[in-house]
């Protein structure tokens, strides 16, 4: 099993909308998805050892599935260790909160631990502009001052950043254009684990 970082490079030119339809390209199937999760867990263990001073926080709404999956896998590898994992909502910290025509509905924050002085690993399924992570950083500081903050992303859409934010742990890197969309499916909510790139192509 090859557990090296997967990089997908795509060079597709946008076409006129009137002649476009959507095409799916599977970046990670179920098997590669699981291998990627396991690799990320091994990388976390290298840096966090027994996790006695570390906590995992999934960013609502989709990052929580990644955080839960990583926590489950870590508990299998380290059954005698206390892996602390929580969910954090960032709705009121988004920079577009008051700019949207429709009101945003906040999700639930679940963190039954203290982050003060801890090493925090923020997790999200797709890293794109970086604005979600900026909001997460601000929201997190409302709960305390961590010793260190790291970022784990299942998918890193490189070259799409609006803010200077880079992940510490990456499952898969994707070079894509703005008209393309990365969709992460989870067996818990979608019936299967998969990462798909949606691209507009000529009919």
Residue ranges and their predicted role:
Residues 5-203:
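PRPP-associated nucleotide enzymes
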């Amino acid at each position: 099993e090859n557990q090296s970082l997967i990089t997908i490079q795509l060079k597709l030119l946008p076409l006129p909308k009137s002649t476009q339809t959507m095409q799916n390209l599977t970046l990670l199937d179920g098997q590669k998805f699981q291998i990627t999760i396991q690799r990320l867990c091994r990388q976390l263990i290298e840096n966090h050892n027994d996790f006695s001073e570390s906590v995992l926080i999934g960013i609502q709404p989709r990052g929580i599935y990644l955080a839960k999956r990583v926590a489950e896998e870590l508990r299998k590898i380290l059954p005698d260790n206390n892996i602390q994992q929580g969910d954090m909502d960032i709705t009121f910290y988004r920079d577009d909160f008051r700019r949207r025509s429709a009101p945003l509905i906040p999700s639930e924050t679940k963190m039954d631990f203290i982050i003060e002085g801890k090493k925090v690993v923020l997790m999200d399924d797709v890293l794109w502009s970086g604005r979600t992570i900026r909001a997460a950083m601000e929201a997190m500081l409302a709960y305390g001052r961590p010793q260190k903050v790291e970022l784990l992303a299942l998918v890193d859409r490189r070259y799409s950043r609006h803010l200077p934010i880079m992940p510490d742990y990456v499952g898969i890197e994707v070079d894509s254009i703005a008209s393309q969309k990365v969709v992460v499916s989870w067996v818990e909510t979608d019936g299967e684990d998969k990462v798909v790139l949606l691209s507009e192509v000529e009919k």
